[in-house]
Amino acid sequence: MAAATAMHSTALAGQSLVKPVNELSRKVGNVEARVTMRRTVSKSAGSDSIWYGADRPKFLGPFSGETPSYLNGEFAGDYGWDTAGLSSDPETFARNRELEVIHARWAMLGALGCLTPELLAKSGVKFGEAVWFKAGAQIFSEGGLDYLGNPSLVHAQSILAIWACQVVLMGAVEGYRVAGGPLGEVTDPIYPGGSFDPLGLADDPDTFAELKVKEIKNGRLAMFSMFGFFVQAIVTGKGPLENLNDHLADPVANNAWAYATNFTPGN
């Protein structure tokens, strides 16, 4: 009788121990399932978006024909166009994709930097020089270069010092983007997130997928814009807003075709 009672007590104790363990396993299993699902969703983000997958818009619309097999709509901005086969090699494709995104971001910042001083100057804000390609030349003037026209901010008189600061600042940003450093571990150097996304704009996978498309589309436009700013500076010697005003005032006399036909080499 005592032995039977002891065995019954042991069985009850075993059941009472198993219940919490099973409950814990169930909860942990659910957490792991949620984590796994969240990671899976993040990997396949954009699968329901019109900008991804086989049915995404192509570079020639319905006349695009068959696109290369390696352009399958997995990445943002893929319109199926690679006539020269520049991205047929997977490693080259990955490298070109990273270069395009990074150059697009710098171009967007550059375009903003070209337009903003000229726009502020037209609004009454005084600058030493508002035209973007003339501003840097002030460093060679007798008084040097004052940032925002204020000598109490940054007063620069050495082009080498400015060059060194640019290398350090831009190099630090790129280094943190690729290697992490003080900003934490980086799992994706193209979209590092973390401290590079303080507002948490990319927390939702679907929103993140759409933002990737918007970024690369605007970045490509910005790269073309910067190229146009360079050409305008060489041909007209004016800033982009001044060129725009001239074109709006007299579109026939101020356009690319008119300047091209009037161009004389050596003059």
Curated annotation (Swiss-Prot):
Positions of chlorophyll a 4 binding: N218
Gene Ontology biological process terms, A to Z: photosynthesis, light harvesting in photosystem I; response to light stimulus
UniProt modified residues of type N2-acetylarginine: R38
Residues that bind chlorophyll a 5: K214, Q232
Residues binding chlorophyll b 5: Q166
Residue positions binding chlorophyll b 1: F59
SUPFAM superfamilies per the UniProt record, alphabetical: Chlorophyll a-b binding protein
GO cellular component terms listed in the entry, alphabetical order: chloroplast thylakoid membrane; photosystem I; photosystem II
Entry binding sites for chlorophyll a 6: H247, A256
Residues the record lists as binding chlorophyll a 1: W81, S87, E100, R220
Keyword set includes Signal: no
Pfam families: Chloroa_b-bind
Disulphide bond pairs: none
Keyword Membrane: yes
InterPro entries per UniProt: Chloro_AB-bd_pln, Chloroa_b-bind
Record GO terms (molecular function): chlorophyll binding; metal ion binding
Biological role: The light-harvesting complex (LHC) functions as a light receptor, it captures and delivers excitation energy to photosystems with which it is closely associated.
Domain-related comment: The N-terminus of the protein extends into the stroma where it is involved with adhesion of granal membranes and post-translational modifications; both are believed to mediate the distribution of excitation energy between photosystems I and II.
Designated name of the protein: Chlorophyll a-b binding protein, chloroplastic
Source species taxonomy: Eukaryota, Viridiplantae, Streptophyta, Embryophyta, Bryophyta
